[in-house]
């Protein structure tokens, strides 16, 4: 049973976060190890394993990047944990320039404007990956995921800069 089936959801990039959360809470309640405290050793072990599976699946599905990676895995393209380098020099140059721009920011307004710019870039790549998945262009979707990881890391660096500068 895959993660989507576990939560009773279709295998799609776009999903209802509220429904995912509700299903997660329901499955947690249903398979919580405390509910099996008087059960056999085997059933207690199975409930612990099921609870761990539910937690793992939820973590994968709630994060858009890991959700895309999982959809790719289900379709035979596994890029999790790979160390393949991006082959897009323009994108890599843009990332270097963005990081240099971030390093030079000292004012709150400039940081918020920069954050807005990076969020727009992130949303555009999310839209691209969604379109590529819908068109079954799996290798292109995988390349977008690689780019999204760079952008997600930059978003994290923005949060760190915000804490450092204005924290």
Report the location of each language-model feature.
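C-terminal accessory/regulatory regions appended to core domains
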Residues: 1-167
């Amino acid at each position: 049973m895959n993660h989507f089936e576990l939560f009773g959801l279709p295998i799609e990039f776009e999903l209802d976060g509220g429904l995912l959360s509700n299903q997660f809470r329901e499955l947690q309640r249903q398979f919580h190890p405390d509910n099996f405290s008087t059960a056999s050793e085997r059933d207690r072990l199975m409930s612990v394993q099921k609870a761990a599976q539910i937690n793992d699946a939820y973590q994968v599905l709630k994060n858009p990047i890991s959700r895309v990676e999982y959809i790719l895995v289900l379709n035979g393209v596994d890029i999790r944990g790979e160390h393949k380098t991006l082959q897009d020099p323009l994108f890599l140059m843009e990332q270097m320039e963005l990081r240099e721009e971030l390093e030079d920011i000292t004012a709150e307004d400039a940081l918020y404007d920069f954050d807005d710019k990076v969020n727009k870039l992130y949303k555009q790549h999310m839209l691209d990956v969604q379109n590529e998945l819908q068109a079954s262009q799996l290798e292109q979707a995988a390349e977008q995921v690689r780019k999204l990881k760079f952008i997600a890391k930059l978003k994290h660096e923005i949060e760190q800069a915000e804490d450092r500068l204005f924290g």
